[in-house]
C-alpha cells in the first residue's frame, strides 16, 4: 500500500514493479494499491531543484521532492500533482487507502508502516535548514497513512553504529570521521583477530594520497581573517564537507582501486558521492530516542563496530564479552531493548535477540 502522504515517481515505480515481478515471479501489480492523493514526483522537479543550486549549499540530494510537494500544495497543474489524476494511474489499483487501512485494522489485521529518512532530519525538530522536506517522526508516518496516533503501536527505531549523512554541506554531524579512518580501524580490529583486512591497505593509502593532491590545489579564500590553509579548512564556516573532498579524490584513482574501496565506502543513492560518516554520538542518539519513543531497537552495521563477524553472523550468534556492554549502553540511552542486530546486508546476517 502506498498511502496518501507518499510521493511517487511514476517512471521509477514502473521500473521497480517490473523488477520485483521478474525477480519473484509474482505480478506485484495485483497486490499494489496506491492512494489517489499520493503526490507525484517528475523529472522536472529534479531539474528545478538542481537548477536553483540550493541543494549544493544545503547538502540536499537534489532529487526534487520539495519541489514536488510545493506543487501539490499550490495545486499547480490542476490535478497533475496527485496520482489519481495522471495518465499512468490507469495501470495501477488506485483506491482510498485510508478506508482500506483502517478497515483492515478494524478486522484485526496488523499494519506495518515503514518510515523514511533519519529522525534527526525532521523539518520541525532537526537542524533546520539542514533537514528533509517533511516530518520523519512515527506520528507523522501514521498521519500520512490516515491512521490515528491513538492506535496501539510497536515502534522499532533503526540505529546505525556509524551514522551517515548525505554528501556535501549537509549540516552538523558530531564525531564525523573519514572513510579511510574508519577503514583502517576496521582492518586493525580484524588483524588483531587474525583475519584478513576488508580493504587492502594499499588502496587506502592511494586514496589518502589522492586527498592530499586535491587539498594541495586549494588556496585560502579571500576574507578568511588571515587564517592559514589548515586553520581555514577546520573552520566550519569555510569547510567543504569530507564527502565532497572524497568524491574529488576518487577521480585520481584507477578503477581497480575504486573497486577495492567500494567494499566499504558508502555512496549516495542518486549522486553517487561518498556519504559522510561519523561515530555514534550519545546526545544525538538520546534525542532521536526521545522523539521516537521506541518500543524496540534494530541495531544495524554491527559489523563496522565488530568486524570479526563481517557478513558472518547467523540467527544463533552469541554475543561476546565486548558486544554485550556495547548493546547494553545503547539500550540504556534509548530506554528500549535491542531486538535485532545486523552484521551484513542480508537476512542471514541478522541476529534476533530473545
Sequence positions of predicted segments:
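Non-transmembrane, aqueous-exposed alpha-helical and coiled segments at domain scale
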Residues: 1-354
Amino acid at each position: 500500500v502506498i498511502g496518501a502522504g507518499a510521493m511517487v515517481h511514476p517512471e521509477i515505480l514502473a521500473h521497480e514493479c517490473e523488477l520485483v515481478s521478474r525477480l519473484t515471479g509474482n505480478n506485484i501489480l495485483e497486490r499494489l494499491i496506491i492512494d489517489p492523493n499520493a503526490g507525484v514526483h517528475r523529472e522536472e522537479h529534479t531539474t528545478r531543484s538542481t537548477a536553483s543550486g540550493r541543494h549544493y549549499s544545503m547538502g540536499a540530494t537534489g532529487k526534487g521532492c520539495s519541489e514536488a510537494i510545493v506543487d501539490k500544495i499550490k495545486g499547480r497543474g490542476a490535478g497533475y500533482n496527485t496520482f489519481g489524476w495522471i495518465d499512468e494511474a490507469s495501470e495501477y489499483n488506485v483506491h482510498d487507502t485510508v478506508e482500506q487501512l483502517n478497515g483492515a485494522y478494524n478486522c484485526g489485521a496488523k499494519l506495518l508502516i515503514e518510515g523514511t529518512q533519519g529522525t534527526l532530519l525532521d523539518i520541525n525538530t532537526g537542524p533546520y535548514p539542514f533537514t528533509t522536506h517533511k516530518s520523519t517522526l512515527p506520528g507523522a508516518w501514521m498521519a500520512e497513512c490516515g491512521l490515528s496516533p491513538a492506535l496501539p503501536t510497536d515502534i522499532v527505531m533503526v540505529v546505525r553504529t556509524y551514522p551517515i549523512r548525505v554528501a556535501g554541506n549537509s549540516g552538523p554531524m558530531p564525531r564525523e570521521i573519514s572513510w579511510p579512518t574508519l577503514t583502517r580501524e576496521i582492518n586493525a580490529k580484524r588483524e588483531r583477530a587474525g583475519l584478513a583486512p576488508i580493504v587492502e591497505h594499499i588502496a587506502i593509502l592511494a586514496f589518502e594520497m589522492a586527498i592530499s593532491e586535491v587539498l594541495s590545489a586549494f588556496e585560502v579564500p579571500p576574507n578568511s581573517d588571515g587564517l592559514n590553509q589548515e586553520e581555514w579548512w577546520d573552520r566550519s564556516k569555510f569547510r567543504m564537507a569530507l564527502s565532497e573532498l572524497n568524491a574529488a579524490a576518487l577521480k585520481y584513482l584507477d578503477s581497480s582501486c575504486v573497486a577495492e574501496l567500494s567494499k566499504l565506502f558508502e555512496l549516495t543513492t542518486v549522486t553517487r558521492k561518498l556519504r559522510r560518516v561519523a561515530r555514534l554520538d550519545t546526545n544525538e542518539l538520546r534525542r532521536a530516542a526521545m522523539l521516537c519513543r521506541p518500543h524496540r531497537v534494530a541495531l544495524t552495521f554491527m559489523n563496522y563496530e565488530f568486524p570479526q563477524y563481517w557478513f558472518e553472523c547467523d540467527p544463533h550468534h552469541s554475543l561476546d564479552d565486548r558486544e554485550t556492554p556495547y548493546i547494553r549502553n545503547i539500550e540504556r540511552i534509548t530506554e528500549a531493548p535491542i531486538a535485532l542486530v545486523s552484521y551484513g546486508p542480508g537476512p542471514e546476517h541478522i541476529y534476533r535477540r530473545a
